[in-house]
A protein has these predicted regions:
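Transmembrane helix interruption/hinge and helix-loop junction motifs
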Residues: 53-59, 152-156, 172-174
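Short intrinsically disordered, low-complexity coil segments enriched in acidic
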Residues: 1-7, 173-183
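Short, charged/polar low-complexity linear motifs in solvent-exposed/disordered segments
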Residues: 42-44, 123, 175
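Membrane-embedded helix bundles of polyisoprenyl
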Residues: 70-81, 86-171, 179-196
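Residue-level recognition of short, well-ordered coil/turn positions
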Residues: 20-21, 134-135, 174
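Membrane-interface coil-to-helix junctions
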Residues: 1-72, 94-117
Length: 196
């Protein structure tokens, strides 16, 4: 966290605040590295706007807390969508949002993994919601949650796409069309990252 993410956050924030816009090249490592196509790019994740508002240290703590809350509500929503009782939903959501795996990410300073972990249950909830309702709102929600995972950690995103596809296969055949539409919209969201 202090050797990779903190300096990058500081550099990006300073460049934006100085009026230089979003930096596309990181001059801090070696002879420089591109920032935009970096899979752990910090400024494409929408919730990282918090770092422009708060000091970086406070922003990191706030971001972690915010993602713990998002993880809790995501797991609770997923369980309630599957007819789990409120009490069991709350208990499992607490266990998920305070899981040792997530806290190992926090201790290691893996900001992208922390952020993506929060949206895993939301992706599955949106998938189930899309297979049941098959409407534009459900397609857009799934695309949004997949984009949030994509913009925070690419490996978790890849795993989610595969498992999401397998989940779609358990529903009716026309659900595959919804899967494809949601992923085309996701691709459109991701074009600014993929084009350079």
């Amino acid at each position: 966290l202090t050797e990779f993410f903190w300096p990058l956050l500081y550099y990006i924030k300073q460049q934006i605040l100085l009026g230089n816009g979003i930096p596309l090249w990181n001059t801090m490592f070696f002879s420089g590295t591109p920032l935009l196509p970096d899979p752990q790019n910090l400024f494409i994740y929408p919730l990282n706007i918090i770092f422009l508002i708060l000091p970086i240290d406070a922003g990191i703590l706030t971001s972690i807390l915010l993602h713990l809350i998002i993880a809790f509500f995501g797991m609770y929503q997923l369980l309630r969508a599957n007819d789990t009782s409120k009490k069991v939903g709350i208990i499992i959501a607490i266990l998920y949002s305070l899981s040792p795996k997530l806290f190992s990410y926090i201790e290691a300073g893996h900001l992208g993994l922390i952020q993506s972990w929060a949206f895993i249950p939301w992706v599955y909830w949106a998938t189930i919601n899309l297979c049941r309702k098959k409407n534009l709102k459900s397609i857009l929600l799934l695309s949004l949650f997949l984009y949030l995972v994509y913009s925070s950690h690419i490996l978790i995103f890849a795993i989610l796409v595969v498992t999401n596809f397998l989940l779609f296969l358990t529903f009716k055949k026309n659900a595959i069309v919804m899967f494809l539409i949601s992923h085309i919209i996701l691709l459109l969201f991701s074009l600014p990252i993929l084009i350079p």
